[in-house]
Amino acid sequence: MKKKIAIIGVGIAGLTLANLIKKNSDFEFMLYEKEESLSLDDGFGIQLAMNSVSILNKIDFQKVNSKDIFHPKAIDFFTIKNEKICDLEISKFNSEYSKYTTLRRSTLIEFLKDEIYTQHLRFGKHIKEVTELKGKILIKFYDNTNDLVDYVVGADGIFSNTRSFFEKKKNQPSFKKAIAV
């Protein structure tokens, strides 16, 4: 019998993991998202370092239309007061197949959702409780449904609620008051 993984969160991390599992393993999986739908608004641009592009290439990232991506040659770093700290020529780190890449977040989400959207994704699933049951993990949701899984992956972002079910300390992100453009 296949082991089952619950992936909590349908952002870039959760969708990427789901695609990797679908393509390369014998695990069953389900993605759970507390929102009612997947936001595909154009939104912000994101930056992908070469390591992340090399991972995305394993799930056919090269299928994304080349008109929708950009490969900058350098990055300038500034303080919050718009004072330049330094610049970095990032094209030196590129390889033939993995290049520093920028694109709209919605473009990446659209690509990631295509292979898993209908059969592996459940919306409106806000976790109420997580308990152990006979060596497995029972996840109860506020909509009075539940799932019994072998593993849980918290991919619900920096302000993750999933972690609170598994660890006592609160994870607080810190902002260093610097930006890169």
Describe the role of every protein-language-model region.
Residues M1-A13:
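Beta1/beta-strand and adjacent pyrophosphate-binding region of the FAD-binding site
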Residues A13, S37, F159:
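Conserved Rossmann-like nucleotide-cofactor binding loop
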Residues K3-I5, K22, A49-V181:
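Conserved N-terminal helical subregion
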Residues V10, G45, T101:
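Charged, low-complexity surface patches
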Residues L20-D42:
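Glycine-rich FAD pyrophosphate-binding loop
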Residues I8, Y32-E33, A155-D156:
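Active-site flanking residues adjacent to catalytic metal/cofactor-binding acidic residues
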Residues S37-I55:
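Conserved N-terminal glycine-rich FAD pyrophosphate-binding loop of Rossmann-like flavoproteins
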